[in-house]
């Protein structure tokens, strides 16, 4: 059975009124819902693509202005922590937008991972819709209040071993670590990555994992464990 969208309720949560409400309906339409009701307009995928870029720009600008002396590497990794799927899921939860998602009956949302993905995509799609309807300013007004304050962002930078290693090598050696990723397979044949981290062309650590990002974290963690006396 097709569901209707309470446009005013969503607009109230966003504190933004659409001049083109159809954009909001599209943003709320998960691809699985459109598969069940193909005559019911577009799904949210294209708006997700646009919203991802809008979110990245606003967060980049916010960090750039908030931390005028922070280098590009730390700005980049901090931005990643504020725009990843987990972060977007949390933004959706803060605004209580998930209840408005139009999703197909057969779509798996029982798992936490499935819910994170669906809600993260929803947030990006809504940002894309807001941007098309009103431009960057209203999108910024939605995003910035959801971001952690400066004091909360500072420790966030050091939670990731890559950030801690970068800070350590910059402070002590005035250089940045370099990561090299190689294909790797686990004992059961699952593909993944073997990442090596070098500092001044010397191998400092290695990591093995299914994703390159996780392998980089493990390599950085090993490098810290053998080179940073203050790691604890």
From Swiss-Prot:
Record keywords, A-Z: Cytoplasm, Endonuclease, Hydrolase, Magnesium, Metal-binding, mRNA processing, Nuclease, RNA-binding, rRNA processing, rRNA-binding, tRNA processing
Residue numbers binding Mg(2+): 48, 121, 124
One Pfam family in the UniProt entry: Ribonucleas_3_3
EC category: hydrolase
Domain DRBM per the UniProt entry, residue ranges: 160-229
Annotated Gene Ontology cellular component terms: cytoplasm
Family annotation (Gene3D superfamilies): 3.30.160.20, Ribonuclease III domain
Location(s), subcellular: Cytoplasm
Catalysed transformations (reactions): Endonucleolytic cleavage to 5'-phosphomonoester
Domain annotation RNase III: ranges: 7-135
Essential cofactor(s): Mg(2+)
Molecular function terms, GO-annotated: double-stranded RNA binding; metal ion binding; ribonuclease III activity; rRNA binding
InterPro entries assigned to the protein according to its UniProt record, in alphabetical order: dsRBD_dom (IPR014720), RNase_III (IPR011907), RNase_III_dom (IPR000999), RNase_III_sf (IPR036389)
First-listed, main subcellular location of the protein, grouped into a coarse class: cytoplasm
Record PROSITE patterns: DS_RBD, RNASE_3_1, RNASE_3_2
Its EC number(s): 3.1.26.3
Role according to the record: Digests double-stranded RNA. Involved in the processing of primary rRNA transcript to yield the immediate precursors to the large and small rRNAs (23S and 16S). Processes some mRNAs, and tRNAs when they are encoded in the rRNA operon. Processes pre-crRNA and tracrRNA of type II CRISPR loci if present in the organism.
Family membership: Belongs to the ribonuclease III family.
Protein known as: Ribonuclease 3
Originating organism: Chlamydia muridarum (strain MoPn / Nigg)
Gene field: rnc
């Amino acid at each position: 059975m097709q569901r209707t969208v309470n446009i005013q309720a969503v607009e109230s949560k966003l504190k933004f009124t659409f001049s083109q409400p159809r954009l909001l309906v599209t943003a709320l339409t998960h691809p699985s819902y459109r598969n069940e009701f193909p005559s019911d307009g577009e799904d949210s995928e294209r708006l997700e693509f646009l919203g991802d870029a809008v979110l990245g720009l606003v967060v980049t600008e916010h960090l750039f202005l908030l931390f005028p002396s922070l280098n590009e590497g730390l700005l980049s990794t901090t931005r990643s922590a504020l725009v990843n799927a987990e972060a977007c899921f949390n933004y959706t939860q803060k605004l209580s937008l998930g209840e408005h998602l139009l999703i197909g009956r057969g779509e798996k949302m029982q798992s936490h991972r499935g819910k994170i993905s669906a809600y993260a995509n929803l947030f990006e799609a809504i940002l894309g819709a807001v941007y098309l309807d009103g431009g960057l300013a209203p999108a910024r007004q939605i995003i910035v209040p959801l971001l952690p304050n400066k004091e909360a962002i500072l420790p966030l930078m050091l939670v990731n071993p890559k950030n801690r290693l970068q800070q350590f090598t910059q402070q002590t050696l005035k250089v940045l670590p370099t990561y090299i990723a190689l294909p790797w397979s686990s004992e059961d044949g699952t593909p993944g990555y073997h990442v090596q981290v070098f500092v001044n062309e010397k191998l400092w650590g290695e990591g093995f994992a299914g994703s390159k990002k996780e392998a980089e974290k493990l390599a950085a963690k090993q490098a810290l464990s053998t080179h940073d006396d203050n790691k604890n």
